Curated annotation (Swiss-Prot):
Quaternary structure and partners: Heterodimer of a large membrane-associated beta subunit and a small pyruvoyl-containing alpha subunit.
Keyword Cytoplasm set for record: no
Subcellular location: Cell membrane
Known role: Catalyzes the formation of phosphatidylethanolamine (PtdEtn) from phosphatidylserine (PtdSer).
This protein's encoding gene: psd
Pathway in which the depicted protein is active: Phospholipid metabolism; phosphatidylethanolamine biosynthesis; phosphatidylethanolamine from CDP-diacylglycerol: step 2/2
Protein name: Phosphatidylserine decarboxylase proenzyme
Keywords, in A-Z order: Cell membrane, Decarboxylase, Lipid biosynthesis, Lipid metabolism, Lyase, Membrane, Phospholipid biosynthesis, Phospholipid metabolism, Pyruvate, Zymogen
Lineage, uppermost ranks: Bacteria, Bacillati, Bacillota, Bacilli, Bacillales
Catalytic function, reaction form: a 1,2-diacyl-sn-glycero-3-phospho-L-serine + H(+) = a 1,2-diacyl-sn-glycero-3-phosphoethanolamine + CO2
Cell membrane recorded as keyword: yes
Organism of provenance: Bacillus anthracis
Length: 262
């Protein structure tokens, strides 16, 4: 019953008009009125911001803010996979040979997430990692490794929330929400970076479309809190053992080791 009611409420409020109205407001000068309250409620670390709080003219500018130079360091070890974002480490685990994985009691299909069987087959037997970004986090997304971009594509339309309620009651939000996917070939091994849109402000902006990416390089940004899913081929990585669900991660922090580079 709760799941049915939750989904009904989302469907009634999560339309194009609502998304458009909220997006236009966030991009308007009028939204600057609530910036101080937003920063206080979500406890934004103003010491790290590139500009002072009063210099952001709209909520959109604050959402997509940059950090001061030197506030994040990228692990330079050739064997490391780094966190592509600031966020909360949600979960990791094996991708079954059936091209599915379980998180928070819900089964997700890699075929659904990536749009077809051929793409999904590449990750059968591999590893997934999920990182959640709250409204307080830095919203720019960086590459977790270096390599050649093999494909960029967008799937989905509407988005369910990716918070705890959305993960429990939503329609498989990680594989059904609006999402932007970048696949990278790194030394012959593949990784998919799935950028999952958030409810209402359903926007993910790519910053470039170059054929290669470098570890730590800026790739895109969310316009509100959301989630990143990383998919790795079989026998490609070993997740850092110390990582725990609920742990805060910072951009550039080592989260896994490349097995071929050990």
């Amino acid at each position: 019953m709760r799941r049915t009611l939750y989904r009904l409420m989302i469907e009634l409020t999560n339309g194009r008009f609502t998304s458009y109205t909220l997006r236009k407001f966030a991009q308007s000068r009028l939204s600057s009125i609530i910036i101080p309250s937003y920063a206080k409620v979500f406890q934004i670390n103003q010491d790290e911001m590139e500009k002072g709080l009063k210099e952001y003219r709209t909520l959109h500018e604050l959402f997509t803010r940059k950090l001061k130079e030197g506030k994040r360091s990228i692990d330079t070890d050739a064997s490391s996979i780094v966190s592509p974002v600031d966020g909360v480490f949600a979960d990791h685990g094996p991708i079954e040979d059936t091209k599915t994985f379980d998180i928070k009691g819900k089964r997700y299909s890699i075929v659904d997430m990536l749009g077809n069987e051929e793409r999904a087959q590449r990750y059968a037997g591999g590893t997934y990692m999920v990182i959640y970004l709250s409204p307080s986090h830095y919203h720019r997304i960086h590459s977790p490794l270096s390599g050649s971009v093999t494909e960029r594509f967008v799937l989905g339309r509407k988005s369910y929330p990716v918070n705890a309620a959305g993960m429990e009651y939503g329609k498989e939000p990680l594989s059904k929400n609006y999402r932007s996917v970048t696949e990278v070939n790194s030394d012959g091994e593949h990784m998919a970076l799935v950028k999952v849109g958030a409810m209402f402000v359903n926007s993910i902006e790519l910053l470039h479309e170059r054929d290669t990416v470098q570890k730590g390089e800026e790739m895109a940004y969310f316009t509100f809190g959301s989630t990143v899913v990383l998919l790795f081929e079989k026998d490609m990585i070993e997740v850092v053992q110390e990582l725990k669900s609920g742990q805060e991660l910072r951009l550039g922090e080592k989260i896994a080791t490349r097995l071929a580079h050990k």
